């Protein structure tokens, strides 16, 4: 009896692995199954709002291992399990990725081919508020071709964070009078 193709194995395992990961309080970002000699390599990438530490990786690894053992017929043999968190260079492809990147610096390639380096603010299911070239603006996800977090070795400027917070709160960009009072809203 031949084993199912790699993509089919991952597709059959994804619902039960996702359930185990979710029950532990994490998001399944990726499930990949590859042949590695006589064994299969099952790579599980997980994330959470607050990030993932080594203790959490161990907990998830035990939970996923139990699920895989219960579904060993799908793997058709022995396997090696690798549980990891996404790297810093993971592309931001889902709204939750943007929410987790709040206040981080992100390199964005727009659909029109232009590139921006932005600081991320409030994100919802349609788009994200960013600080780009000193201006607060909103990017719709549909206009983003690729986005990756930039590594920073120092704290972001406090002024940038304040501006993004004010934008999230709906406050005027500058403290001046723009006719935008509580009564006029």
UniProtKB/Swiss-Prot annotation:
Describe the task this protein carries out: Required for maturation of 30S ribosomal subunits.
Q: Which GO terms describe its biological process?
A: ribosomal small subunit assembly; translation
Task: Name the GO cellular-component terms.
Answer: cytosol
Q: Where in the cell is it found?
A: Cytoplasm
HAMAP family per the record? RimP
**Main location (coarse class):** cytoplasm
Q: What is this protein called?
A: Ribosome maturation factor RimP
Which NCBIfam families does the entry link to?
PRK00092.2-2
Superkingdom to which the source organism belongs: Bacteria
Any idea which UniProt keywords this protein has?
Cytoplasm, Ribosome biogenesis
| Signal peptide start and end residues | none
Q: Which family does it belong to?
A: Belongs to the RimP family.
Q: Which InterPro entries match?
A: Ribosome_maturation_RimP, RimP_C, RimP_N, RimP_N_sf
